[in-house]
Every structure is written in C-alpha cells, then in structure tokens.
Amino acid sequence: MQKPQLLVPIIATSNGNLVHAAYFLLVGIPGLGPTIHFWLAFPLCFMYALATLGNLTIVLIIRVERRLHEPMYLFLAMLSTIDLVLSSITMPKMASLFLMGIQEIEFNICLAQMFLIHALSAVESAVLLAMAFDRFVAICHPLRHASVLTGCTVAKIGLSALTRGFVFFFPLPFILKWLSYCQTHTVTHSFCLHQDIMKLSCTDTRVNVVYGLFIILSVMGVDSLFIGFSYILILWAVLELSSRRAALKAFNTCISHLCAVLVFYVPLIGLSVVHRLGGPTSLLHVVMANTYLLLPPVVNPLVYGAKTKEICSRVLCMFSQGGK
C-alpha cells in the first residue's frame, strides 16, 4: 500500500497566480528513522555547546586582551563571531527536529534561515581570504605589515565582507517567493538551503540556477582562487628563507588558517559537485551540507585554541584560576 503524501496549506498571492506553502516540512537525514534521529540529537547538542563555548571564549579573550588587538586575532574574532551565529541558526532547529520530531518551519522563517546561512557563509569566505592576505603580508612583507593592516583597515575589510555577503544573497528570498510550489512541501534536509527549496517548485527555476551558480563562482570561487594564490606566494617566500627553523616557524603561523580553509572549502566543493549532478536530494548531499555547516564552528576554536599560544595560555590561565 502506497503511503499518502502529506499536504501542506497553500497561500496564494494577491494576483492569484503564484502560490507557496504556509510552512515546509523538514525531513532531517533521509533514510533514518525517528529513533536514530533521536539519538543523533545528543551529539548534536554537544557539538552546539562546544561550538558556542569555544567561539565565545575566543571572542571574549580577544576582546579583553589588548595585546591581541592585532590583525590576525581581529580576523579570528570575526571568524568566531560568524561561526557562533551560523551554529545558532542551524543547530537549535535541528535539535528540535531530531529530539521532538518538530518538522514544521514557516515559509518566511525558512527563507530567512536560508538567506542567513548563505550570506554568512559568504562573509566567512571573505574573512578567510582576509586572513590569508594577513599571513601573506606578515611573511612576505613583514616590515610593511603594521602599516598595511591597521585597525581601521581591518574594520573596513570586515564591513566590506559583511556588505558583500548580504548584498549578493539579498535577492534569493525574493526569487524563491516568486516561484509556485507543488502540493508536497517536504524538504529532504535538516535546514533550509536555496537548492533544496528550489527543487520543490513547479515552475521554471532557470533564474535561480543561473544566479546561484553566478554567486558561487563570483564569491566563493574567486575567494578560494585568491587564497590559493596567496599560499603559493607564501610557500615561495618560506622556501627562500635561509634558515630551516625560520621557515618552519613562519609556516607554522599558517597551519591553523589552512585547517580552517580546508574545513570550510572541502565540504563546500563537495556539496556543490553533488548538487550540480542533479536528481533528488541524496544522503551524500545532506551529509556534505551538514559537514559544511556544523563542522567549522566546532573545529575552528579547537584548532586555533591548540595552535595559538596566546589564546591557549589564556584559556589555561582561566581554568587554573577557576579551579582555585
């Protein structure tokens, strides 16, 4: 016996032609039953607590310690703030879905979540590029580092990254609102992403496809190319150093950033490739999306906390004082 499709209330626009759902239904991870989802909620809550504690700690340490008011740490504070917001946008809703089976998400809230996820991801990409530029100047032009990356310049870079991310992705919710949707409104995902909402439409989505591809190439694509080019120049400069110890010390300052870049871009590239292959949303697609959104907020504080001596020592000092 075929399982009946779950129908969702439809809202029509004033012209009576375009329709959209009152809410969408989130599936979570396709193929997994309620019991598995329930048990997955506990590691998810642990990840959220770890991401919140880790990123908040980094932001507060950099805010309090005036000696850390340098470009590298200011960019790190921006990265931690973005990760903190991104994890708060995705993880609590996922936890309610996994723990209590609350699948419903209102149409406009879904669009807002989608917009913030994509826009803040673009901002994070720009901050990672800025951090690569900081490492390039520090290693290749150390005498000019203080004059090139002043506090004012860092603030302008941060504001530009935020503006670019929000401006590029601002049209997406409106483009999705113009589409008509089918009678079934089940999103085979744990949260709302542009490509998954777009697949539910009964109308032509070529504008969405073209604009989405344009954003990926012009934002994340360009950023990743410049990051790669920066590291080619950094590697070239490091290899030209006469002392092996100096070369290792110089490159060691880049390891944390390289880890952050890999954790962000590898799942993003995988997600883009899987999506471009077309077809229904697969388990691999969902896993890649979850990795892309959930892993960086958890991993970045751990990597920077372990590899950055100033932050690590401050955290150890806080714990030692708290234990007295």
Swiss-Prot record:
The keyword Cell membrane applies. It is a multi-pass membrane protein. The keyword Cell membrane applies. Keywords: Cell membrane, Disulfide bond, G-protein coupled receptor, Membrane, Olfaction, Receptor, Sensory transduction, Transducer, Transmembrane, Transmembrane helix. One of its GO terms (cellular component) is plasma membrane. The chain crosses the membrane at residues 39-59, 68-88, 113-133, 153-173, 210-230, 251-271, 286-306. It holds the Pfam family 7tm_4. One of its GO terms (molecular function) is olfactory receptor activity. Residues 60-67, 134-152, 231-250, 307-324 are cytoplasmic. Belongs to the G-protein coupled receptor 1 family. PANTHER family: OLFACTORY RECEPTOR 51D1, OLFACTORY RECEPTOR 56B1-RELATED. This is Olfactory receptor 51D1. The gene is OR51D1.
